[in-house]
Amino acid sequence: KLWFKFLHGGEIPATEANLRDAAAGEHFEWSDMYAQFAQEAKEEGFDKIAYLFEAVGEIEKSHEQRYNKLIEDLEKGIVFSREGDTVWLCTVCGHIHIGKEPPMQCPVCSNPKGYFKIKPENY
């Protein structure tokens, strides 16, 4: 919060605006910045470094895709709501909740629903 007074007039923008800004930043990083770094490294004969810049660019591209998916879910109103029963995981304490939405507050650690995510099944 220390730094927010220097950004956006000290106000915290809405989540969707923050996600759009983040997605735009990631887009710049993979499509322009790291691509340029890779090109310059190749031109200077640093093939391994060029490869690493390209690989990091792909990671940044996946970040942009993730932010855009979150924006889409926000617009659809499904970040914290699904049609059928869903397994929700509290990322603070590990509490499991099954339902269409997570609870407003975790019954174990008392953190708000923003700390819940859909439980991943990839181990």
Question: Where are these predicted regions, by residue range?
Answer:
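Non-heme di-metal
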Residues: K1-Y123
